[in-house]
Amino acid sequence: MKTWHMVVVIGFLATLAQTSLALKEEDCEVCVKTVRRFADSLDDSTKKDYKQIETVFKKFCKTQKNKEHRFCYYLGGLEESATGILNELSKPLSWSMPAEKICEKLKKKDAQICDLRYEKQIDLNSVDLKKLKVRDLKKILNDWDESCDGCLEKGDFIKRIEELKPKYSRSEL
């Protein structure tokens, strides 16, 4: 009887340990969010065929920027990708595996996939632009796909951001 209780307790603890080791979204945020967004964009007929998923993913990758573009590079979704582990994404997606589990498998193949992190967004309504570095001001403009031709000094970048702020910054009412 004691042996049976011990087996049950060990089984319970093993299950508990397994669930606590499962990958969380914040551990691999770029992967999880990109896989979810991609999976949501697929129609039902495409979701069943992993070859079609790979083709659609390559098209999807052509439109990605920044961290998502790097994620595509690591998976082999870009023409210039050095390696290709695309089937580690496409096959589990065709089985309707959740994004967290897919990213867990991808992390085992290539750990740098989960090293990708989104940069913290700057709240333009509360930040003092004069206190930011020029690098951060350039990043704001770059994120907006805007340029600042002829900007040499910090004041020039701040002026350009202030001009564009109404277009890109929507304050909650």
Swiss-Prot record:
SUPFAM superfamilies hit by this protein: SAP domain
Family matches, as InterPro entries: ARMET-like, ARMET_C, ARMET_N, EF_Hand_1_Ca_BS, SAP_dom_sf
Annotated localization: Secreted
Key word Disulfide bond present: yes
Main location: secreted
Signal peptide: 1-22
Cysteines joined through disulfide linkages: 28-114, 31-103, 61-72, 148-151
GO biological process: dopamine metabolic process; dopaminergic neuron differentiation; neuron cellular homeostasis; neuron projection development; synaptic transmission, dopaminergic
Entry function: Required during the maturation of the embryonic nervous system for maintenance of neuronal and cuticular connectivity. Essential for maintenance of dopaminergic neurons and dopamine levels.
UniProt family annotation: Belongs to the ARMET family.
Protein name stated in the entry: Mesencephalic astrocyte-derived neurotrophic factor homolog
Species annotation: Drosophila sechellia
Originating gene: Manf
